[in-house]
Design a protein with these regions (language model features):
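Compositionally biased terminal segments of proteins
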Residues: 2-184
Length: 184
């Protein structure tokens, strides 16, 4: 079973929805107005903040921040929404574990592990020597160590991701060198 590293945000792929800031705010206000007394969590729609992310990319994204309340606990939740990414072969249903057994299950769809690896590999190649995001290397290592990865599907996902992001494959990258691997 995959033991995930801690993360501070939720990453979503926006499909069949505009990345217009005003539209996203309305959508999140509607989501926040849905009451679920079973879990006791309240999302404060008046605290909504939306900021552009990945503005240098083909399809800029949006970071949505909102306060969540559980009794006296207040926590800011950050949701990064990307647009225009490809998922190979397609988004897959995710069996997401719940902390409370009496709360209704959530229906989620997620990237295939092969697409997840392809995107992390793309980040490694795109940043090459300037990559300070060791989390991508750790994540790829963990995914290969703890899961069976379909190598054919992975190759397809890498090709699709690089093509979609207009990134040519380059040989002799510094990140594949011994010097990069042993650099402290």
């Amino acid at each position: 079973r995959f033991k995930a590293r801690p993360t501070i945000d939720i990453d979503l792929l926006g499909e069949r929805i505009s990345n217009d800031k005003g539209n996203l705010k309305v959508v999140f206000e509607k989501i926040c107005s849905i009451e679920c007394e079973d879990d006791g969590v309240f999302f404060d729609a008046s605290s909504l903040e939306l900021e552009p992310i990945a503005i240098d990319k083909k399809y800029p994204g949006t970071c949505v921040k909102i306060e969540a309340h559980l009794d006296t606990i207040v926590q800011q939740v950050s949701v990064d929404i990307g647009f225009g990414d490809v998922v190979t072969p397609y988004p897959l249903p995710l069996d997401y574990p719940l902390l409370l057994s009496d709360v209704p299950a959530v229906e989620l769809y997620a990237y295939s592990l092969e697409t997840l690896i392809a995107e992390k590999f793309h980040a490694m190649v795109d940043r090459d020597e300037s990559n300070s995001r060791m989390k991508d290397f750790f994540d790829v290592y963990q995914l290969f160590t703890n899961h069976e990865i379909d190598r054919t599907l992975l190759a397809e996902a890498i090709v699709c991701t690089f093509k979609n992001r207009n990134t040519p494959y380059r040989e002799h990258l510094a990140l594949f060198s011994d010097a990069f691997a042993t650099d402290k």
